């Protein structure tokens, strides 16, 4: 990966890092027959995907913990001092700490000594009116979610990217710990949108993408985020910024996750993944459509727990913000084919900002019955009919 950065530049490097991280999320635990800590590693899996692919992934995170200069300095010192030797996690940690002067126990505990992944989710961002402190102060409320591990990451450096209404971006950095965290950032730009880890410096249990739209297009397969988006309408001369985060962790309201308010018909919501859609686009004049594909045909697929037996009660759940209840999304239809093969597509005709998750439930519970006493009499003609009918 570092060679690619030197050869082709930062953007190509980050693309390679993301490609590798997506492979790790999708395939490493399948090829290696489970989720494993990098140390100790079972003998049978020492030369597997975890050692090589996830190893590269977490070393990228070490660079984010240390910064470029200290990472380079420390790496060179450790290699020079330990060349030709064998190191376990304890001696490697001591070597890096001696070379950098930084306490790296949080990194080793999070990325080396336990399996799985962590992902940080932005629950809310509130910007105060500028006062005595120069710039805009934004208070962030964050949640850390886990996949296939037990311990939350501590002292984790995290980029916070803000965009103003003109689409300019500015990056600040915070250090956060635990399941829930609050932090503040001060920026010169007035935030119109805020995102975590948009610069790709930290590999997590999530994939993300932000991109600009300036013209209509058919459905496009977006890299990394398992989503197709198209643009049906956009005003001439306008542009829109779209950001997609695909989190490989349970949605709020799933068993073991943060409790969430849900419509009465929601029986279960995905405990494996969900999306956050955000962006800078006008409320009028832009129409995006999307396709969310669910896959539950076998136990290795993310939606097996929801749809492995049947898709009969499948629906697309959505909430505008984490403070809102999960409800059935208003503008979609389901294309399932067979209801018993675990696979299908939620076809969204109008994409909105918010969080999306796959769910099960009898959505007819949310449909209020007609009040027969206050319902006007209606006539349908002709009867019988062949091509059309009239309702009066």
Regions found by a protein language model. Give the residues of each.
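Surface-exposed loop/edge segments in extracytoplasmic proteins
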Residues: 166-174, 323-332
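Residue-level detector of functionally pivotal "anchor" positions at catalytic/ligand-binding pockets or at interdomain
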Residues: 359-381
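Surface beta-strand/loop "capping" patches
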Residues: 110-152, 211-236, 373-376
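Beta-strand-rich binding/interaction modules
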Residues: 118-195, 392
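Surface-exposed beta-strand/loop patches in extracellular or lumenal glycoproteins
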Residues: 90, 140-161, 283-308
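Hydrophobic alpha-helical and helix-loop surface patches within well-folded domains
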Residues: 1-141, 148-149
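Self-processing/autoproteolytic domain segments and adjacent N-terminal interaction modules in large
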Residues: 214-328, 352-363
């Amino acid at each position: 990966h570092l060679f690619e950065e030197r050869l082709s530049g930062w953007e190509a490097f980050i693309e390679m890092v993301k490609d590798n991280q997506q492979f790790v999320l999708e395939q490493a635990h399948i090829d290696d027959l489970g989720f494993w800590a990098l140390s100790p590693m079972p003998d049978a899996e020492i030369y597997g995907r975890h050692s090589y692919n996830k190893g590269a992934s977490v070393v990228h995170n070490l660079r984010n913990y240390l910064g470029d200069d200290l990472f380079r300095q420390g790496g060179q010192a450790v290699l020079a001092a330990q060349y030709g030797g064998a190191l376990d996690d304890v001696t490697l940690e001591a070597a890096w700490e001696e070379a950098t002067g930084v306490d790296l126990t949080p990194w080793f505990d999070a990325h080396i000594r336990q399996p799985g992944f962590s992902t940080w989710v932005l629950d809310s961002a509130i910007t105060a009116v500028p006062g005595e402190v120069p710039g805009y102060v934004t208070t962030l409320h964050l949640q850390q979610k886990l996949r296939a591990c037990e311990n939350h990451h501590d002292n984790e450096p995290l980029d916070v990217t803000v965009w103003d209404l003109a689409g300019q971006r500015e990056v600040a950095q915070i250090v956060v710990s635990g399941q829930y965290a609050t932090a503040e950032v001060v920026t010169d730009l007035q935030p119109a949108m805020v995102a975590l880890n948009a610069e790709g410096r930290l590999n997590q249990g999530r994939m993300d993408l932000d991109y600009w739209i300036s013209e209509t297009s058919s459905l496009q397969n977006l890299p990394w985020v398992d989503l197709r988006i198209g643009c049906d309408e956009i005003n001439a001369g306008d542009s829109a910024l779209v950001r997609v985060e695909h989190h490989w962790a349970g949605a709020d309201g799933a068993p073991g996750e943060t409790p969430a308010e849900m419509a009465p018909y929601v029986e279960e919501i995905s405990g494996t993944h969900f999306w956050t859609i955000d962006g800078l686009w006008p409320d009028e004049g832009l129409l995006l459509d999307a396709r969310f594909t669910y896959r539950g045909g076998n136990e290795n697929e993310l939606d097996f727990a929801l749809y492995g037996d049947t898709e009969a009660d499948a629906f697309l759940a959505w909430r505008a913000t984490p403070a809102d209840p999960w409800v059935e999304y208003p503008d979609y239809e389901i294309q399932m084919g067979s209801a018993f093969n675990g696979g299908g597509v939620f076809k969204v005709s109008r994409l909105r900002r918010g969080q999306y998750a796959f769910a099960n439930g009898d959505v007819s519970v949310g449909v209020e019955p007609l009040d027969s006493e206050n319902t006007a009499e209606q006539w349908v003609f002709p009867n019988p009919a062949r091509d059309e009918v009239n309702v009066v």
